[in-house]
From Swiss-Prot:
Keywords: Chromosomal rearrangement, Cytoplasm. Disulfide bonds: none annotated. SUPFAM superfamilies: Clavaminate synthase-like. GO terms for molecular function: 2-oxoglutarate-dependent dioxygenase activity. This is HSPB1-associated protein 1. May play a role in cellular stress response. It is linked to A chromosomal aberration involving HSPBAP1 has been found in a family with renal carcinoma. Translocation t(2;3)(q35;q21) with the putative pseudogene DIRC3. Produces a hybrid mRNA encoding a truncated HSPBAP1 lacking the first 36 amino acids. Residues 88-208 are annotated as: Interaction with HSPB1. One of its GO terms (cellular component) is cytoplasm. Residues 369-379 have a biased composition (Polar residues). Interacts with CRYAB and HSPB1. Residues 124-288 form the JmjC domain. It holds the Pfam family Cupin_8.
Amino acid sequence: MAAGSEATTPVIVAAGAGGEEGEHVKPFKPEKAKEIIMSLQQPAIFCNMVFDWPARHWNAKYLSQVLHGKQIRFRMGMKSMSTVPQFETTCNYVEATLEEFLTWNCDQSSISGPFRDYDHSKFWAYADYKYFVSLFEDKTDLFQDVKWSDFGFPGRNGQESTLWIGSLGAHTPCHLDSYGCNLVFQVQGRKRWHLFPPEDTPFLYPTRIPYEESSVFSKINVVNPDLKRFPQFRKAQRHAVTLSPGQVLFVPRHWWHYVESIDPVTVSINSWIELEEDHLARVEEAITRMLVCALKTAENPQNTRAWLNPTEVEETSHAVNCCYLNAAVSAFFDRCRTSEVVEIQALRTDGEHMKKEELNVCNHMEVGQTGSQNLTTGTDKPEAASPFGPDLVPVAQRSEEPPSERGGIFGSDGKDFVDKDGEHFGKLHCAKRQQIMSNSENAIEEQIASNTTTTPQTFISTDDLLDCLVNPQVTRIVAQLLIQGRSL
């Protein structure tokens, strides 16, 4: 395996390399693969499961021929090592064909066309989140080249998939997906994945700005973190792996992930698998949408692009958002009536747990892993024994990224990773909040006026308030309370 990949990850041998494709036997039958996916609580790599997929040969050159002349939107980002994440709202965008992308990616200095303003040595390009149904709308037969049915999902193919094509350095900021779990098939090139478990949510400083339904972003650039500003990130449990062609990565529900292309051209195909927990998650997302749109639109109605992710067409009105919320709650109850799992009763019996957590909101940044995991995932499922081995490789936890791999393709001496003199963010604000709450309103004003050193910390912006209101832990409690109130 190429340098930088996990030592325990086996190299995938192309079908036919050691014999005819018919001689290959997949290590897991569809039923077993699905059982693993539905029970596994940690990321893992499936090997030798896609050697007979036609999509195995979908490299960028082939796709450029299939999509000849079709305009695709590329996200353009800087090859830099800032401690600030490159969110989609800060990137530029280019409409181009895959042929034009490949020409630009060859680093031709005299290039003209849509990429002419972007120096290949300074910028990366990423055609991300490209849904098959839109990309191949006139070539639907290609849907059959992807066979998620091999993983126990009959009838699931390219129609439920998205395509990702990127250049060296192209990446997705660290985030978690609100819905489902994820299967990612690496077709061409390698990608470096940095993953963090759900219980690390308090240490990743979640934010909903930029706003995108179903995506909770981290304020941290996890490959070059600002530990003075985000000291709790030291507690995060990083899992890292290099995904190679022919491998399929399983990302469990609510695992945070940062993904970066580490080869000149990468092609990936993924599919989000729906889960039972998504019914409650849709209520949480509807609450989030209502709060974000109401507060951010009121703050600056003329500049929605500053806070709305480009994947969202436009901000929705309060009336529309109310409809979304009511529809999500109704769908939840409809599901409960048809499901053998009485989720409402589970919410009721969990009330005592919720009260205990609410009392510890002040210690949000200090909560133990068990408590935060209960809030983040909402369920405590026993982890079934999984047949790990050469064909199912767990993604290992790494206490620290090796210096050569920090920041992916961009070097770093690691000096910015350690801040010995940084203040403890969680304890500082919790103590300050307790002190303020014990005083009268006038005393608070006098304290703020007399202590200029606390002014930057006591100023609360709309985004500061939003980060608290739509924190995944908070919206889950709100969703539970809404449903309890309708079911009593």
